[in-house]
Amino acid sequence: MENIIHVNINPLITGFGNWAVSWHGFFSFVAVLFAVVLVGRWAEDYNLDQDIVYHVAVWGIIGGVIGARIVHVIDYWWFYQNQPLEMFMLWKGGIGVWGGVLGGFAGGVLCAHINKYPKYVLTDLAAPALMFGMVIGRIGDIINGEHCAKVYEGIFAMSWDHAASDVSNCKMKGAGIGIPVQPAIIYEMIWNMLSLYIIWYFRFKLYPSGMLWVLFLLLYSIGRLIISYLRYDKIWVPLNFFGMDISITEAQVIAIICILITLPILIIKVNFKNFSSFQFIENSSKTRAEKRRQNKNK
């Protein structure tokens, strides 16, 4: 039992009646903020005006929030069907990452399409920033204990001990307050960090534009498909392979679809390029503001 990681932190930072701010919500906000700041700073590396990037980011955030909440509500419909008002209480936490990714993608691409912005370049710009944001967001998941992982007492098992922890919603699945479970959220955070390293390594090495985003989707899908087997989520497709339960959840269904789409795209379309002697932005002593004004006058 000495190998168990105990989390005994109140999942709510503050609250007033039905209004509450959770650590999950706080770190989700910080993650989005960092992602927006990063894409703004990296914009000039892609010869993009920061105003364009921020314009698309607003649409992406709106689409991401809507998509994330919809996917979460669908996955936990057994809870929300009896408490429908809880669907709109975003400040309490509760999002589906897949919904955030795909909803944000849809919102951003729609904005780029309407305004004739280079959408594939913008998706490549967003890929590492979004993965970085996911790493930050997982800190809130670790504190809140939102994910129902499978009961486990081995090395690095996790136990949420605070009475208000969201893990209390996992009682019907054998988990609950003070019960050691798989550190699935830690594994996912580590996978996201590794994926961030891979994405950053291939930044400016893959073309045509859009391939870095495809790589992002593939990496996240692989991690989510595998790690979800350590969690208890609603089963969408019951499967049994020679007596072994390999039933598939909502997140895994989406992950499999993404893998089936992104892997062939990377195999067929991606090309590698050595940029060691190539510069997207020539060296200059000009400030960012001066560069933006110069680009606007072109």
What are these language model-derived features?
Residues 1-298:
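A feature for loop-to-transmembrane-helix boundaries and adjacent hydrophobic helices
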